[in-house]
Amino acid sequence: MYDLGPDFDDATLAPGTNVLVSGPPLSGKRRLALELLAHGSAQGEGAIVVTTRDSASRVLADYEHLVTDPESVDIGIVDCVTKHQGRSVRDTDVVKYAASPEDMTRMGIKFSEFVEEFRRQRGLENIRVMVDSLSTLLMYSDVQTVFRFMHVFTSRIENADALGLHVIESTAHDDETMNTLKQLFDGVIDVSDDGFSATLPSVDPAD
């Protein structure tokens, strides 16, 4: 089970759950998703961030502010930004690179590599995954292409018994696009300047 912490009244989500974190620009949705990852790190869980808008160094810097012992955190970042900016980089234990936010095939491969490493080499049972952001994917590809990719990606999260947190800018897309993508997720966290509301799947106590 995945504990969401006191901000969510200590609600828990079943392994394999995918949640859409939706809100307008500057509403704090990215930070909320990072905080949910950090809450898992505090309990010894793994964290994987697929970033299509910020470099891995920025993600790491922001994440380190949210955890008490950054050196002990098991985190992996799939960076789809740095190579796209023309910089020459190689994969490390912490960061793997895709060519651009359009390179969804490589994005999926690198993500799967991290899941395999976390499970087999580090012995991590629980993994929280953050994708930031679906809106960037939609800047480079049409909604049908993104839907197909995310259908596969969310299935991988489900098969890995991980928890998926997928960030999107709600005001950047029309209702049809939002409704199409929402079909892929088990729950939604709507973030606004005033806070957030969550529609999450209930968990059977027998689980």
Where on the chain are the PLM-derived regions?
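Glycine-rich P-loop/Walker A and Walker A-like loops and their local beta1-loop-alpha1 context
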Residues: 2-64
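Short, well-ordered beta-strand core segments
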Residues: 19, 47, 164, 188-190
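Loop/turn-to-beta-strand initiation segments
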Residues: 46, 74, 125-128, 159-167
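Conserved nucleotide-binding/hydrolysis micro-motifs of P-loop NTPases
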Residues: 53-57, 82-85, 135-136, 170-174, ...
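P-loop NTPase catalytic phosphate-binding loop
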Residues: 56-99
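Phosphate-binding/switch loop-helix module in NTP-utilizing enzymes
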Residues: 84-152
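Substrate-engagement module of ASCE P-loop NTPases
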Residues: 136, 148-172
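Phosphate-binding/switch region of NTP-binding enzymes
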Residues: 166-207
